């Protein structure tokens, strides 16, 4: 198999096995993104880097889906992190929806690398590269938005739960129509399959709690940073 086939084959095999070196490398990159996002979030070049990386990743991935007429059960953007990629990248300005998906994208990226569930293709297939670089770009774009434009008044806990349950209800319907496993609502990892309705409730509750926790951690960090700034000026 030549390099072109490795990149773009439609023949599913099995997902790559991630070893210790991979985990060390990925989490080093994640730490670097957290640090640089905090330090360079106001730099246009830094913002553009992650925006361009995300755009290229999405164009290549969905171009590959389209050219190869991949089934709707796999090729629609209804995975949580992919929805976040589109919203954080394309939605302009400050809004509760962009903020919600930036919080989701921050947690989702960490979860995706702690417990990776990539597509069944060999490395460096476009789907595997998209999984890696797409999530890294999502984290960068999400952190830049949250560190620059976060507004705690936009999203309270109740709204987070309502938005998550509403979003997953949409994904639930898409899965019924396409036979897919978007949002891992059909076969949730870790907890296993407990039936469609129970899966929906479990995933929605867990995701709502995770986004809420991410929100609280961010607010605590921003509060501490504000106190440091006040102390410096005093």
What is each stretch, according to the model?
Residues 65-75, 94-96, 117-129:
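Membrane-interface helix caps and helix-loop-helix hairpins in membrane proteins
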Residues 10-26, 156-166, 176-215:
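Membrane-interface transmembrane-helix boundary segments in multi-pass integral membrane proteins
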Residues 54-64, 105-118, 164-175:
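Aromatic-anchored segments of alpha-helical transmembrane domains
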Residues 91-101:
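Membrane-helix interface "capping/anchor" motifs
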Residues 1-46, 197:
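N-terminal topogenic module of multi-pass integral membrane proteins
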Residues 43-92:
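A glycine-rich, hydrophobic loop/mini-helix early in the fold
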Residues 23-29, 77-87, 114, 129-140:
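Membrane-embedded alpha-helical segments of multi-pass membrane proteins
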Residues 31-39, 88, 137-157:
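Alpha-helical transmembrane segments in multipass membrane proteins, preferentially the mid-helix core
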